[in-house]
Swiss-Prot record:
Its main location: cytoplasm. It is found in: Cytoplasm. It comes from Streptococcus pneumoniae serotype 4 (strain ATCC BAA-334 / TIGR4). Monomer. Keywords: Cytoplasm, Initiation factor, Protein biosynthesis. This is Translation initiation factor IF-3. NCBIfam families: infC. The gene is infC. GO terms for molecular function: ribosome binding; translation initiation factor activity.
Amino acid sequence: MFFSNKTKEVKTIAKQDLFINDEIRVREVRLIGLEGEQLGIKPLSEAQALADNANVDLVLIQPQAKPPVAKIMDYGKFKFEYQKKQKEQRKKQSVVTVKEVRLSPTIDKGDFDTKLRNARKFLEKGNKVKVSIRFKGRMITHKEIGAKVLAEFAEATQDIAIIEQRAKMDGRQMFMQLAPATDKK
């Protein structure tokens, strides 16, 4: 069976257990008016009549409550506002990715500067940077050289980054993680 993304999105909004008008199957409800005022506990038929007179919908917003809570509202407008809020929340969400910069224990000055420049670009864009050094062969016996390179890298980026995770070994790799420094002044 084929479902499009739009179908799934509509189902998630409608699937909030919000029963509308004739879908409500309870005897009495605690009723909330159009302006948010409490109208008390009313029989379902009376609540539906009030909603019909106002040309709006009766929406069951809390079916688990005793008695269930229903609100007189324009459901189309409510759904539109809900979708609008969801869209705003997705816009505000920023996706932070972790970029990796690979170094070697015997890296040359020019290569080091190039990797540093790339890492600075990533940090300025707001991404985190994982700096890793892979030890090949017998280089693993000289871990202090790798630690020195990572310390130099951290020192060179200290103006725009903070060390989120200090240098540590993981198998034949030593790595540290940098995060962009946030100035909240």
